[in-house]
Curated annotation (Swiss-Prot):
Residues 12-65 form the MEIS N-terminal domain. It comes from Homo sapiens (Human). The lineage of its organism: Eukaryota, Metazoa, Chordata, Craniata, Vertebrata. One of its GO terms (biological process) is animal organ morphogenesis. It is found in: Nucleus. Residues 108-167, 228-248 are annotated as: Disordered. This is Putative homeobox protein Meis3-like 1. CDD domains: homeodomain. Coiled coil: none annotated. One of its GO terms (molecular function) is DNA-binding transcription activator activity, RNA polymerase II-specific. Residues 123-135 have a biased composition (Polar residues). Belongs to the TALE/MEIS homeobox family.
């Protein structure tokens, strides 16, 4: 069987196409009708050759599918592509609005801000609006509204940004800190207690859970380690005395520890576990 039937070209053409495939089928049918011997004495070899020709034909057709668009692009590169590039700005008049929508969606999902908030008097939010619009960078190029609506929107978004960055309101921090010092014997709130704390603080359950994880590592564990090293001071009163000594930026708040917790006070007013 002639292998040229597998990759025959169209008669008078340079590129293989479906027309050549039909012509090959016609030539093969004529060969069958003429009863010319195209099979050998080895059936396995004949079957292998037929399958190989079919596979090669499939690959040749797939290559042709990928080659035809490339030829068209090369032919029209000097003319059509340049015209399309010149018409691009006119066909996309709402590109800045689309960039603004993209930025707002990513801000709501907690992504990193690429632009700085614009001033209330109006102006571009990015450092160079012209460069960002020419290069297509995803910076916020919208002009701030001169009315008070833009200021109100910025004020509404500020608490959400603070929560996403892990900066909780002082009121919420004081509530969770009070619960922590009131439950020093077991500083692990249950799911119901987490829900109640989230409702009282205005935070999410995940934020409350993360705060207690950090508090047990930054507050409780250092006190336990220090008490193990020092062990100085008188024993804590079973009735429970005001506890102080750990403050960050919040006002000092005194709490009473449960009677089951062994504590000690040193001369500097710091309290520790026994």
């Amino acid at each position: 069987m002639g292998p040229e039937l597998g990759w025959g070209h169209p008669r008078g053409g340079d590129v293989c196409s479906s027309d050549s495939f039909n012509e090959d089928n016609t030539a093969f049918a004529k060969q069958v009708r003429s009863e010319r011997p195209f099979f050998s004495s080895n059936p396995e070899l004949d079957n292998l050759m037929i399958q190989a020709i079919q596979v090669l034909r499939f690959h040749l057709l797939e290559l042709e599918k990928g080659k035809m668009p490339i030829d068209l692009v090369i032919e029209d590169r000097d003319g059509g592509c340049r015209e399309d590039f010149e018409d691009y700005p006119a066909s996309c008049p709402s590109l800045p609005d689309q960039n603004n929508i993209w930025i707002r969606d990513h801000e709501d999902s907690g992504s990193v801000h690429l632009g700085t908030p614009g001033p209330s008097s109006g102006g571009l939010a990015s450092q160079s609006g012209d460069n960002s619009s020419d290069q297509g960078v995803g910076l916020d190029t919208s002009v701030a509204s001169p009315s008070s609506g833009g200021e109100d929107e910025d004020l509404d978004q500020e608490p959400r940004r603070n929560k996403k960055r892990g900066i909780f309101p002082k009121v919420a921090t004081n509530i969770m800190r009070a619960w922590l010092f009131q439950h020093l014997s077991h500083p692990y709130p249950s799911e119901e207690q987490k829900k109640q704390l989230a409702q009282d603080t205005g935070l999410t359950i995940l934020q409350v859970n993360n705060w207690f994880i950090n508090a047990r590592r930054r507050i409780v564990q250092p006190m336990i380690d220090q008490s193990n090293r020092t062990g100085q001071g008188a024993a804590f009163s079973p009735e429970g005395q005001p506890i102080g000594g750990y403050t960050e930026t919040e006002p000092h708040v005194a709490f009473r520890a449960p009677a089951s917790v062994g504590m000690s006070l040193n001369s500097e007013g710091e309290w520790h576990y026994l």
